[in-house]
From Swiss-Prot:
GO terms for biological process: defense response to fungus; killing of cells of another organism; signal transduction. The lineage of its organism: Eukaryota, Viridiplantae, Streptophyta, Embryophyta, Tracheophyta. One of its GO terms (cellular component) is extracellular region. The gene is SCRL25. This is Putative defensin-like protein 231. Disulfide bonds join 30-85, 40-66, 48-79, 64-81. It is found in: Secreted. Keywords: Antimicrobial, Disulfide bond, Fungicide, Plant defense, Secreted, Signal.
Length: 87
């Protein structure tokens, strides 16, 4: 009986800690948007992630999206990347 009680209490505590950590992690993402020459079809999200990682070395980017913007004489791509907020 003691073992079952300890098991249930530890299970509930682990569940609570994990659920709180998920909420904190979800709230700590910030966006950074940059415009780069070129087209998203060439490298897409991987190119945006590589550019952002090289430019902002202290930030760890989680994911990026790439959007093409067609102008008169050239195409630009907008990289919208999510990274963990500092502070």
């Amino acid at each position: 009986m003691k073992f079952a009680t300890c098991f249930l209490v530890s299970y509930v505590l682990v569940f609570l800690v994990l659920s709180v950590c998920k909420e904190v992690e979800a709230k700590e993402l910030c966006n950074r948007i940059e415009d780069i020459d070129g087209n998203c079809d060439f490298e897409g999200e991987k190119g945006c992630l590589k550019f952002m990682t090289n430019k902002y070395k202290k930030e760890r980017h989680v994911s990026c999206t790439c959007t093409n913007l067609y102008m008169l004489h050239k195409t630009k791509r907008f990289c919208d990347c999510k990274h963990r907020c500092s502070g």
